[in-house]
């Protein structure tokens, strides 16, 4: 292990269980939902048919769970604070998720934001692997809409 990688590992180990500041709020519009439906070919009525959804279980259209998951990359502030660019780091790659849950829906027009807590740091495959618990909340809603254990690998 290089000196830079060891220093980065030690730095991140000291930040385990630290939570970052929440990201900025991000609005989930019907246009964004429709665009996501087109890209993923998931045109289920609960997402795109406002008239039918108005009589459905949520009273309106809702975002796809995977749309919520995918915008975690757009709301990087929380993640970047827990995995800052470290000396000698070439890049950070998305390695996947250990666990993903969608406890509540995201109604059209809602605003969401993320908070990230660094939970684990390990050396794997010549890289530093981090696991962040990311919570996506909906403004004014008690339950989060997504809780995920996101894995990243820092390349040195």
Predicted regions: what they are:
Residues 1-15, 102-156:
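HotDog/MaoC-like acyl-thioester-processing domains
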Residues 2-93:
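Hot-dog-fold acyl-thioester-processing enzymes
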Residues 59, 97, 103-104:
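Short, surface-exposed secondary-structure edge patches
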Residues 92, 97, 129-131:
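Short coil/loop residues immediately preceding or within conserved phosphate-binding loops
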